[in-house]
């Protein structure tokens, strides 16, 4: 991002300063997002909330969309204070987001989490997991790998768009949500550990992914069409 900062009209010092706030607060956002949809896990027997358990992130429970939302909020405030073009900064920031998400998914592999359902495909992943309290060997979809590769491909695609076809501030920002939303929506359907919308059968990340992708695509078409005319 620092290497390409000048092309987007952003100072390298502003990137470093923004990361100082965005990184820790994005972790907080990822945790709060997870807690929101699993609130019952953080209640004591008397119904009160266990705030100690809420802050123990080493026990698991971070959701990427919470981190993304918090990062956008932090960037908005930062740009307002520093009088920087938000959409230009956001265009630059999505490249770091994709790299971070691409690498971060391998943490799921190390922790043996965020995998998919059973499959017989040649690239299946063998794991030991507990099913109804019994430890069993399973061959499953390596959904962490799917998303990591999707982010890698998205990064390469957005780099080319930024170099050749970037027409307006916000184009890369919208392209990120369009690309990631579609991929996450389909991959989420394969996972076995999804967050669900308050007791329904609706997968939160799948819904959020498809909705944000649809909105982003519409805004891209409108903005590109307007500029072409």
What are these regions (language model features)?
Residues 1-229:
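A feature for loop-to-transmembrane-helix boundaries and adjacent hydrophobic helices
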